[in-house]
Curated annotation (Swiss-Prot):
NCBIfam families: lpxK. This is Tetraacyldisaccharide 4'-kinase. The keyword Nucleotide-binding applies. It comes from Thiobacillus denitrificans (strain ATCC 25259 / T1). Its EC number is 2.7.1.130. It catalyses: a lipid A disaccharide + ATP = a lipid IVA + ADP + H(+). Belongs to the LpxK family. One of its GO terms (molecular function) is ATP binding. Pathway: Glycolipid biosynthesis; lipid IV(A) biosynthesis; lipid IV(A) from (3R)-3-hydroxytetradecanoyl-[acyl-carrier-protein] and UDP-N-acetyl-alpha-D-glucosamine: step 6/6.
């Protein structure tokens, strides 16, 4: 069966069948965006600066690692950041603040990973302005908010918009959802404040006419054992054996290519993005490698030889300086 992400890489008969739905979707997006620009619908000002990090394409683009980098960087600059997120894949129906007992099933895998890797307060909720209000009420010390995957949530006022692109996949076949991966038209990128292209495995990045973009390299760090997170090994130290590489992320081929670049022999197994892992999905006694995003859902039933690979993005110096100037820090 042809999966949607694969469908989005080319234009075929099924693409053409979906075009009427895609045009209808694109029209709704355009009208809604226009309503906010003209003031027919109003944005909510939460009283402190909001940085929105998102993308105009569906699927993985490296957005979550950039949110983690940005949140940690803001703290290094003397800010006290907090994060709001939709909590995709979680069951929470109201605004929920993440804590030590939070699970991916409740709040979503990406917010849980952000919280654990930054230590920043994180609130998830379908209503972004409401989530931001809860965050401010519970953490009055927060002086700046990072909105995870919030580019299309126009109701939340924002001081800065950052769009993230995957340099390898770009805009796919260029069609709107569901015929293609576009949540919004390409021209939306000319309205945001900055565009970051995430480059995996030292690959090339793309040049788009009239569009200024910065580069951020997607890098693999150490691997850590799920049952004993304090036990860490360089990724190349795992190259002496074959692994089952299992992941439920938007662009699994990027993870597999990264393992290959580090000489790690593996059998790839891709699950749907945000997959809710169960104990019988993977061999309990096998040697398994996964991403950190997957690990937050597997820690409770991990086998003794299951490991998670630290993944991070490192933006180029020019982007960091631009960001520092824009924020006045």
């Amino acid at each position: 069966m042809l999966s949607l992400p694969r469908l989005w890489t080319h234009t075929g008969p099924l693409t053409l069948l979906l075009l009427p739905v895609a045009w209808f979707f694109a029209s709704l997006v355009t009208v809604r965006r226009l309503a906010f620009r003209r003031g027919w619908l109003t944005r909510v000002d939460v009283g402190i600066p909001v940085i929105v990090v998102g993308n105009i394409t569906a699927g993985g683009s490296g957005k979550t690692p950039l949110v983690i980098w940005l949140t940690n960087w803001l703290r290094e600059q003397g800010h006290r950041p907090g994060v709001v997120s939709r909590g995709y894949g979680g069951k929470a129906r109201r605004c929920v603040e993440l804590g030590a007992e939070s699970t991916a099933a409740e709040v979503g895998d990406e917010p849980l990973l952000i919280h654990r890797k930054t230590g920043a307060p994180v609130v998830v909720g379908r209503d972004r302005p409401a989530a931001a209000r809860v965050l401010r009420a519970r953490h009055p010390e927060v002086d700046i908010i990072v909105s995870d995957d919030g580019l299309q949530h126009y109701r939340l006022g924002r001081a800065l918009e950052l769009a993230v692109l995957d340099a390898a996949t770009g805009f796919g076949n260029g069609w709107p959802l569901p015929a293609g991966p576009l949540r919004e038209p390409f021209r939306r990128l000319h309205e945001v404040d900055g565009v970051v292209q995430v480059v995996r495995g030292g690959g090339a990045w793309r040049t788009y006419l009239g569009l200024k973009t910065w580069r951020a390299d997607y890098r693999a760090g150490d691997a850590r054992r799920l049952r004993a997170p304090e036990e860490r090994k360089p990724l190349r130290a795992l190259a002496q054996r074959e692994w089952l590489a299992a992941t439920g992320i938007g662009r699994p081929e990027g993870f597999f290519a990264m393992l290959e670049a580090h000489g790690v022999r593996h059998r790839p197994r891709a699950f749907p993005d945000h997959h809710a892992f169960r104990p019988d999905d993977l061999p309990a006694g096998g040697a398994v490698l996964m991403t950190e995003k997957d690990a937050v859902k597997c820690a409770d039933f991990a086998g003794p030889d299951w490991w998670a690979v630290d993944l991070e993005v490192v933006p180029e110096a020019g982007f960091v300086e631009w960001l520092r100037t824009r924020l006045g820090s």
